[in-house]
């Protein structure tokens, strides 16, 4: 051992649940609660569902260390060229149609203790969930039809990290701040503003 502590096994139980439509669900384990949706319509509805879930679990939620909101948006070049959907600074050599393979852009912004990581991936392939997203528990939207095509995947993850005891008003305010920052960054990427 040489004085180095021996790692111990920690059992993690992961629970998943979806709504009746199959487009929204929760992933809950001993360290986190995540809400996933593949049919995002309204932040207020999503925030309300998340806060209701946390309120139900408030006896078990003692300490908050991270709050986050992540959105994935796929833009296909079918009805509109990608240049009509994505800002030009994210397109790379997209105009080189004959031999264009992919372009990858990543940015990290930090403001008011909110970290926002933005990834824009343009490629000619099948559209799929990133490997770190558990997309297998939810129904996939029509845009993920498994047909290879030229498309842009915009992946934006905005989060707060710290150590705070459970407080409903604090959670609501931080999630609103996170969403505002995420929306600002997304509007910097897309042509049609949200």
Residue ranges and their predicted role:
Residues 42-44, 48-63:
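Secondary-structure boundary elements
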Residues 1-8, 32-34, 68, 194:
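Charged, terminal alpha-helix-loop-beta segments
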Residues 148-194:
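Long, compositionally biased interface segments
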Residues 11-18, 64-145:
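Aromatic/basic-lined ligand-recognition segments
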Residues 43, 77, 162-164:
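Residue-level signal for secondary-structure boundary sites
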Residues 1-28, 166, 170:
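N-terminal low-complexity, intrinsically disordered segments
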Residues 24-39, 63-72, 148-161:
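Glycine-rich, often proline-containing surface loops adjacent to acidic residues and nearby aromatics
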Residues 34-45, 166, 170, 174:
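Conserved aromatic-histidine-acidic binding/catalytic patches
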């Amino acid at each position: 051992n040489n004085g180095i502590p021996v790692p111990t096994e920690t059992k993690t139980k992961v629970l998943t649940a979806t709504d009746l439509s199959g487009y929204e669900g929760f992933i809950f384990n001993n360290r986190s609660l995540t809400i996933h949706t593949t049919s995002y319509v309204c932040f207020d509805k999503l925030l309300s569902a998340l806060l209701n879930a946390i309120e139900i679990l408030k006896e078990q939620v003692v300490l908050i260390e991270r709050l986050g909101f992540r959105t994935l948006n796929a833009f296909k070049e079918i009805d509109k060229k990608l240049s009509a959907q994505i800002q030009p600074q994210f397109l790379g050599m997209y105009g080189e149609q004959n031999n264009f393979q992919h372009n990858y852009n990543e940015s990290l912004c930090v403001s008011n203790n909110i970290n926002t990581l933005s990834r824009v991936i343009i490629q000619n392939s099948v559209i799929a969930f990133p490997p770190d997203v558990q997309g297998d528990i939810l129904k996939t939207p029509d845009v993920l039809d498994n047909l290879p095509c030229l498309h842009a995947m915009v992946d934006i993850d905005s989060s707060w990290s710290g150590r705070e005891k459970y407080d409903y008003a604090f959670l609501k305010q931080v999630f609103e701040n996170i969403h505002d920052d995420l929306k600002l960054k997304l509007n910097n990427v897309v042509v049609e503003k949200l």
